[in-house]
Amino acid sequence: PPYFAPYVQGFKTIKPNDWEAIKTSFDDTTAALMIECVQGEGGVNLIDPKWAQAAAQAARKAGAIVMADEVQTGFGRTGSLLASDELGFEPEVVSFAKGVAGGLPMGGILFRGKANGVFKAGDHQSTFAGNPLACAAGLVVLNELQKPEFLEGVKEKGEYIRSQIKNWKNKNVGEVRGKGLMIGADIVEGLSAVEVEKKLLENGLLTSTAGKNTLRLVPPLNISQSEIDEGLEILRKTLETF
């Protein structure tokens, strides 16, 4: 998104699921490929697993490592521990944050393969890294995510929310997509997703926007069925006012 500018130097961006770009984007000057497993700020755009695997293969053939940006998608958000597991491209580096400590500030990087050993014990990475409170919360989150029924519940809740919104056939909503509890609903041209977001907040439902005109729904992973239905009712009634 433009509001992230200026972008980090040294990166060349390619559109997700662009097969032609794979053929021309990698050479012996390429250090790494980073894949955002579901484009969050870009509009909750899904990545084709076959494309991700092909892009990773092309990058490795050029001598590069493959990295996964799991800051938004990691630790259960999409219904898997890591969304890259679902895409099947097996990254050497994974960055994560947000949900790992259940809302407390925490983040980290995982390394393996060619990237293993880049950081060693004692290397400075973060002033407040490893603080006891966030780590204790992280352990609780990880224990919950180890339960298969929890992650399966995330998938079921997400499918329920998406199907309900689609079934309304509201004139103000275009495509509805997502994975797990990372959901995007495109707002049709002529109506601003930001205006919908503001009205929803007035009515008691916290959402956000992404991409060009997408309403983004990312509820807590432990949201109850009654809370889902309450939120959906607010969303339905609000959309009908436009």
Which residues does each PLM region occupy?
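Conserved N-terminal phosphate-binding loop of PLP-dependent enzymes in the Aspartate aminotransferase
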Residues: 1-242
